[in-house]
Amino acid sequence: VALWNKVVERNPGCAIVDASGIIPALRSVKSSSEIKMIQSAVDFTARGFADAMQFVAPGINEYKVQATLEHGYAMAGGRGSAFPPIVGGGLNSTVLHYKDNDQDLVAGDLVCIDSGAFYAGYGADISRTVPVSGKFSKRQKEVYEIVLKAEQAAIKAVKPGVTLGELDAIARTIITKAGFGEYFIHSIGHHLGLETHDTCGPMAPLKKGAVITIEPGIYLPEEALGVRIEDDIEVTATGYKNLSKAIPKSVSAIEKAMAK
């Protein structure tokens, strides 16, 4: 109070203004340099995911998959992980923020990998769900294709003026119509930047230069089956650019990437 009184004495007419909303608004739009750094982080992440897909096999411990991811990031040029990696096999794939990463992978299960490399203050945030044995079962493929359809529809709708809430509704409608609405237990995504869950809320219209994640999922604990697919998306003047499109995502592309 004493300090404020001195400020008022020396600067008549000054007032305290709430600027808490200014910084988030500024951070929600990235410069071209910032987007390049995020793209670099995504590219380094692609190396880690490629190594992990080759490494995943029955009997491998989740933490060894994490180690493979992080080794790939470092060898590609990354500076560690943007956040603690999630590597959840079987029932653990249905745990949204699973963090133990200490169980052996089991043949016939899926493993959900949610991770991203860190570079120059910025990080990637990617999720892929892959079959431990290298091939999706009929049921796994059925659920996976629904999540993929929802993700692709939401990505295609990204453009300036759209909100994350509207993108959520697009993906959620597809998953709900397929009979899995109650198993999509989180929102569609978030802003990405200096923090993994960067500032700016889900109802603010997206602007050119924003970078967001799109990450629908279906989690069936009674089947020990969880699927999440996540990409990092730049909002462009006329639509979007998928910064992580190089990371295998279709059933056939994942199975090919895992072939020994």
Walk through the language-model features, giving the residues of each.
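Active-site neighborhoods and metal-handling regions in enzymes and metal-associated proteins
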Residues: V1-K260
